[in-house]
């Protein structure tokens, strides 16, 4: 089979051999005419539409970029506003906390003052009650001592002391003497 191809190749004359890369002239002419028509149609109708679509696309992309930039700027402004509000809220919270602390200290001081006043009042009331009880006890003791001394004096003297004025004078003199002795002994 190889021999057949070789024999077929030898029979062709050399000058008639055609270059497969360069087509004949009539093919080139008839190829240029439809190419020019297609190029004209493409140039006149397709390319403007294509350019219009590309321009719309470009406008959409640029508009999207502008919208994204404006949205980013708005977001940044909102973030700054939020941070400012947060800082203001923290400052206000610190001020409220300080006010509450000072009010708490004031309330504590007021309560201590009230407690001190109440304590002093209770102590004073206690002193008054003790003084009243002491006076009552002293009065009762004087009365009992007076009666006991009269009974003792009647036993010693062997007679009854009948005069109440005399009795009370004797008792008062005796108790005054005891008070003087008690006061000088202190």
Curated annotation (Swiss-Prot):
Subcellular location(s) of the protein: Cell membrane
Annotated Pfam families: ATP-synt_B (PF00430)
Keywords: ATP synthesis, Cell membrane, CF(0), Hydrogen ion transport, Ion transport, Membrane, Transmembrane, Transmembrane helix, Transport
InterPro entries reported in the protein's UniProt record: ATP_synth_B-like_membr_sf, ATP_synth_b/b'su_bac/chlpt, ATP_synth_F0_bsu_bac, ATP_synthase_B_chain
GO cellular component, one term: plasma membrane
Transmembrane segments: 28-48
Major localization listed first in the record, in broad terms: membrane
A GO MF label: proton-transporting ATPase activity, rotational mechanism
Membrane topology listed for this record: Single-pass membrane protein
Family: Belongs to the ATPase B chain family.
HAMAP family: ATP_synth_b_bprime
Subunit structure: F-type ATPases have 2 components, F(1) - the catalytic core - and F(0) - the membrane proton channel. F(1) has five subunits: alpha(3), beta(3), gamma(1), delta(1), epsilon(1). F(0) has three main subunits: a(1), b(2) and c(10-14). The alpha and beta chains form an alternating ring which encloses part of the gamma chain. F(1) is attached to F(0) by a central stalk formed by the gamma and epsilon chains, while a peripheral stalk is formed by the delta and b chains.
Protein known as: ATP synthase subunit b
The organism's taxonomic lineage, starting at the top: Bacteria, Bacillati, Actinomycetota, Actinomycetes, Mycobacteriales
């Amino acid at each position: 089979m190889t021999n057949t191809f070789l024999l077929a190749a030898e029979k062709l004359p050399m000058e008639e051999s055609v270059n497969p890369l360069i087509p004949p002239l009539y093919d080139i002419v008839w190829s240029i005419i439809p190419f020019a028509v297609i190029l004209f149609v493409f140039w006149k109708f397709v390319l403007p539409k294509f350019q219009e679509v590309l321009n719309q696309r470009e406008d959409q992309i640029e508009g999207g970029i502008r919208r994204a930039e404006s949205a980013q700027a708005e977001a940044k402004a909102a973030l700054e506003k939020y941070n400012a509000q947060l800082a203001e809220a923290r400052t206000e919270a610190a001020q409220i906390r300080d006010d509450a602390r000072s009010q708490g200290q004031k309330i504590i001081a007021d309560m201590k003052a009230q407690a001190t006043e109440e304590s002093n009042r209770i102590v004073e009331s206690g002193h008054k009650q003790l003084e009243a009880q002491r006076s009552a006890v002293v009065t009762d003791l004087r009365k009992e001592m007076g009666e006991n001394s009269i009974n003792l004096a009647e036993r010693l003297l062997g007679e009854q002391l009948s005069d109440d004025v005399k009795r009370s004078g004797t008792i008062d003199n005796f108790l005054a003497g005891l008070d003087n002795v008690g006061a000088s002994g202190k």
